[in-house]
Amino acid sequence: MIRRMSSSIKEKNKRILVVDDEVDVLDFLKIYLESLGWEVTTISSTADAFIELEKKPYFLVLTDIAMPEMDGYEFISKIKDKNIPSQMALMTGFGYNPKHTLVKIYKTIRYPCLFKPFNRAKIAEAVQTAYDTYHEDLISGNKSPTEPDSQS
């Protein structure tokens, strides 16, 4: 079941920044996530994404791993270095293979990883989890929203 954003969270940050060099992916995610009630900005380069992140806060940065100017891992690392308070999620076109290096890395860094072609329910679940974690962390003050969850 795909859960729509609850009306009680409308006053909180519900902005998602999607970074991918593929226009079709950006268009799909914008249309789909906006249909669920999220505010979505799409950007095709990491350089432009950093400019956008300085303008306003996003609770989630959803980034492709393989991009021409900077890969998703380096991009996330730089976001953390700049102390930008956002949750992160990765996307990859490699598809899910439990033996693939990307899956092993994903389990190590503990950021959600969405595999292309996308499963809509998994996208909705990953976004809602990131949203809940972001706002819980801000309220509790226990950790920076840029830090991945330390539990398995």
Put a short name on every predicted segment.
Residues 1-15, 121-152:
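Non-catalytic signal-transmission and effector/linker regions of two-component phosphorelay proteins
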Residues 20, 64:
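Active-site residues of response regulator receiver
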Residues 23-41, 108:
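Two-component/phosphorelay signaling modules centered on CheY-like receiver
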Residues 42-60:
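Acidic, metal-coordinating helix/loop segments flanking the phosphotransfer/catalytic sites
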Residues 67:
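Receiver (REC) domain active-site loop signature in two-component systems and cognate sites
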Residues 91-93:
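Hydrophobic/aromatic residues positioned on beta-strands within the core alpha/beta folds
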Residues 116:
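A Lys-centered signature of the CheY-like receiver
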